[in-house]
Regions:
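Electropositive polyanion-binding surfaces
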Residues: 1-178
Length: 178
């Protein structure tokens, strides 16, 4: 079920046309990873689709290298504040038929810094949006999650440790205030 109707999706969908409408986030992050200021502006962007492997080749170039340093500081701040990082392997699932029998293949994809950069940039933009909504007293949906339940390793390793940490995470809930 589409989130928006076909007419709206054609107007505002990312990468559907040559130029797409967007909200662009400019975020000033200090050395401790805290947001010191931000700007949210309507913009027009040209979307270029890349695989994570293609993006990986661009990670050392600007502006991605500078963006990576900013998102690294933000991630370190979140870690020091107690954020849980559940690092599950990304997998590609393929189903094919062999002699009229379905064959399911799993391929474990390597962890890539480009994938982490995208995730951390989205978290940072979400934090700026939340700060804006709070400052302007706008009703805004927040995902709220209490700390994990006690009784587990605070620094799990390996796949089994990550599954155990995920099981200790209480369900998140949606709220309109932080």
């Amino acid at each position: 079920v589409p989130m928006l109707g076909a007419c709206i999706t054609e107007m505002v969908g990312m990468g559907i046309g040559e130029v797409s409408p967007a909200l662009s986030f400019g975020v000033d992050v200090n050395d401790e990873g805290l947001i010191e200021g931000f700007e949210i502006v309507p913009s027009l962007v040209r979307v270029k689709r890349l695989t994570y492997s293609q993006a990986e080749q661009l990670m050392a170039s600007e502006p991605l290298n500078s963006l990576r340093m900013i998102t690294d500081r933000s991630r370190l701040r979140r870690a020091s504040a107690g954020a849980a990082f559940i690092e599950m392997p990304e997998t590609k699932l393929t189903v094919r038929e062999s002699d009229s029998t379905p064959v399911i293949e799993f391929e474990s994809l390597p962890p890539l810094p480009a994938r982490e950069l995208v995730a951390e940039a989205m978290i940072l933009a979400g934090e700026a949006a939340a700060l804006y909504a709070s400052r302007e007293l706008l009703p805004f949906p927040f995902s709220v999650q209490p700390p994990p339940t006690e009784g587990g390793d605070d620094d799990p390793e390996g796949l089994a440790g990550m599954f155990a940490l995920r099981r200790r995470q209480p369900r998140s809930r949606i709220a309109t205030s932080m």
